[in-house]
Design a protein with these regions (language model features):
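Glycine-rich phosphate-binding loop signature in dinucleotide/nucleotide-binding domains
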Residues: 64-67, 158-165
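Residue-level preference for the first positions of well-ordered beta-strands
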Residues: 23, 164-170
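Short glycine-enriched, charge-decorated loop/helix-capping segments at active-site entrances
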Residues: 38-46, 112-114, 186-188, 229
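Phosphate-handling substructures
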Residues: 88-152, 211-217, 223-238
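Domain-level recognition of soluble alpha/beta enzyme cores
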Residues: 186-211
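Loop-to-helix element that buttresses phosphate recognition and phosphoryl-transfer chemistry
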Residues: 25-81, 86, 137-152
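Phosphate-coordination/substrate-recognition cap region in phosphate-metabolizing enzymes
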Residues: 2-18, 56-126, 194, 209
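Eukaryotic N-terminal low-complexity, Ser/Thr- and Lys/Arg-rich leader segments
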Residues: 1-20, 221-238
Length: 238
């Protein structure tokens, strides 16, 4: 082998060049709250058994792909546990938990079933359902603009640290929807984000340009004929 070959620089993880980070975003596995149609928001709920199985399946899939430089995650238990399973499978020791990746704060809607929220907290539910992006949810809840700013800003920071590298990020349904909207703002399609689904972004660490390559990919669940009982695929259950 020539000296040049021995010291060859590996190609960047992103097909768009060394300025871009390939950011693989995974929604956490299922929780009992998802299964029961409970609005979780920033409630700290663990995975249920189905969610743990989903996390193992997505981890198994990601372990067969290019090794990530790091795994980042929301610090909420359902995301952190999913991230830990992925990091272990991918043999990655660099696991970073950060509240910037948390789900949308749902204010007065926290802990309510969707059907009950419409009746018991009509003002909060109306605010949640509003298409006005600056509309905050009563009880300290975030607006969509606030959610987007928090999540997008942190992914830009991650991309700046990992130019030319691949990283995995574990987050939540509504947060991931906002990331997709930021990358593709002209689309009117509401994207379905099932539990442990994969979205792939290429993000320039210099210019902040985003490219959405893939969203809502659950091929790892289909291969094992695993039931996709993933309420909140629209981001609603968080």
């Amino acid at each position: 082998m020539s000296e040049r070959a021995m010291h060859a620089i590996p190609p960047p993880a992103s097909s768009h060049g060394e300025d871009f980070a390939e950011v693989v975003v995974v929604r956490h596995g299922e929780t009992q709250g998802n299964a029961l149609r409970i609005i979780q928001g920033q409630m700290d709920i663990e995975l249920n058994e189905a969610g743990r199985q989903q996390a193992v399946m997505v981890a198994r899939r990601l372990a067969k792909e290019a090794k990530p430089a790091a795994v980042y995650s929301s610090d909420l238990k359902r995301a952190a546990e999913t991230a830990e399973i992925i990091a272990t499978a991918c043999n990655v020791s660099n696991l970073v938990l950060n509240p910037a990746l948390r789900e949308r704060h749902m204010g007065d809607l926290h802990g309510l079933k969707f059907d009950d929220a419409v009746r018991s907290k009509p003002d909060a539910y109306k605010a949640f359902s509003s298409e006005e992006r600056s509309q905050e949810i009563p009880g300290g809840g975030e607006s969509l603009d606030q959610l987007s700013e928090r999540c997008v800003s942190y992914l830009n920071t991650i991309a700046g640290k990992h130019k030319g590298e691949r990283v995995i990020v574990v987050s939540h349904g509504a947060s991931i929807e906002e990331l997709c909207r930021h990358a593709d703002p002209t689309s009117s399609v509401r994207r379905r984000i099932p539990n442990t689904s994969i979205c792939v972004f290429n993000i320039s660490g210099t210019t902040g340009h985003w490219i959405l390559e893939r969203f809502g990919d659950v091929a790892h669940l289909n291969e094992d004929d695993f039931p996709q009982n993933a309420f909140g695929g629209d981001g609603a259950s968080t």
